[in-house]
């Protein structure tokens, strides 16, 4: 009887099920809004290095700096299907294709010359408005890039395996599709010693697409870790200096952990992976950011800066 009385009192002390449900919904709404705000700000373009040493691939680089839009908060790849009707491409691919076509024109490019400069057009014509990569935007991008995609697909039989893989990379519309492509085309082939495939170039491009195109640096880092831990042969073939550069930039873009960056640089030194100019640019980005942090934020700031200086030496 005493136990029942105690239970009756404790039940009365709790709020009703309706108030519990409303309280749960209120807390769920707060946590959801907080997480979405944090995610959008974390993966915004503002967190990307403004002087990133690469664009998409080696043959897409033309020396122009990337101008970051300071007002962009939501990642553009979340709404990439809104501006193209009938055909969708990952964010960032259009400008890279423009640059690619300008450097490597196709045989029938003159017939479909929507991006060729026309001096007879008026000064305010969109065809005279240069993009920040120095190329003329096409008048009908949906049709232009749809036809271009068909042309690239038709060139597969005349292209190297790396070019074919790069074209497959550009067709990935989600990071999950990119992960599936990595699993089928790279990871499952790591045990094939006879396969004549430039593994380091393919891994570097896959990490770069994950890091810049889908703003998922942790996915890029997982690609690196999968190849590194697979076997000594896979590590030697795949983990070159450009791949380590992408790993360093992925760590800094994703979590800004200077100790992790130092760990990767130490791996390069121990395994005699020679640093290149891109490595020094990545270290300079890390050094500049750490040097601007408040002193109370990182107690070992001076020690980390001294170690980064050592890796900056030739």
Swiss-Prot record:
Oligomeric and partner information: Component of the MRH5C complex, composed of mrh5, ppr4, mtf2, and sls1. Proteins mtf2 and sls1 form a subcomplex that serves as a scaffold to bring mrh5 and ppr4 together. The MRH5C complex associates with the small subunit of the mitochondrial ribosome.
Pfam families: Mtf2
Domain of life: Eukaryota
Protein name: Mitochondrial translation factor 2
Annotated GO CC locations: mitochondrial matrix; mitochondrion
GO biological process per UniProt: mitochondrial translation; mitochondrial translational initiation; positive regulation of mitochondrial translation; RNA splicing, via transesterification reactions with guanosine as nucleophile
Function comment: Translation activation factor that as part of the MRH5C complex specifically recruits cox1 mRNA to the mitochondrial ribosome for translation initiation.
Phenotype on disruption: Decreases the association of cox1, but not cob1, mRNA with the mitochondrial small ribosomal subunit.
Biological source species: Schizosaccharomyces pombe (strain 972 / ATCC 24843) (Fission yeast)
Region (Disordered) residue spans: 111-136
One Gene Ontology molecular-function label: translation regulator activity
């Amino acid at each position: 009887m005493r136990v029942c009385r105690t239970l009756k009192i404790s039940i009365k002390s709790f709020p009703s099920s309706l108030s519990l449900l409303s309280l749960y919904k209120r807390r769920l709404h707060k946590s959801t809004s907080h997480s979405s705000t944090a995610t959008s700000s974390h993966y915004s373009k503002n967190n990307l290095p403004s002087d990133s040493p690469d664009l998409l691939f080696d043959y897409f680089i033309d020396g122009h700096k990337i101008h970051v839009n300071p007002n962009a908060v939501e990642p553009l790849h979340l709404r990439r299907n809104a501006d193209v009707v009938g055909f969708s491409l990952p964010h960032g691919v259009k400008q890279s294709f423009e640059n690619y076509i300008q450097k490597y024109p196709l045989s029938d490019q003159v017939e479909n010359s929507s991006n060729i400069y026309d001096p007879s057009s008026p000064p305010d014509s969109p065809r005279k408005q240069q993009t920040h990569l120095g190329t003329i935007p096409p008048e009908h991008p949906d049709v232009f890039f749809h036809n271009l995609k068909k042309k690239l697909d038709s060139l597969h039989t005349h292209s190297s395996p790396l070019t074919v893989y790069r074209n497959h990379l550009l067709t990935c519309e989600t990071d999950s599709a990119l992960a599936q492509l990595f699993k089928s085309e790279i990871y499952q082939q790591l045990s094939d010693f006879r396969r004549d495939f430039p593994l380091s170039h393919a891994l570097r491009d896959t990490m770069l697409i994950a890091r810049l195109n889908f703003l998922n640096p942790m996915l890029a880092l997982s690609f690196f870790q999968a190849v590194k831990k697979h076997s000594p042969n896979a590590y030697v073939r795949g983990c070159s200096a450009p791949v380590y550069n992408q790993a360093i930039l992925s760590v800094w873009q994703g979590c800004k952990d200077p100790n992790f960056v130092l760990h990767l640089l130490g791996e390069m030194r121990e395994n005699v992976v020679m640093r290149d100019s891109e490595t020094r640019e990545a270290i300079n980005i890390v050094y500049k950011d750490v040097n601007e942090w408040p002193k109370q934020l990182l107690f070992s700031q001076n020690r980390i800066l001294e170690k980064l200086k050592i890796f900056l030496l030739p």
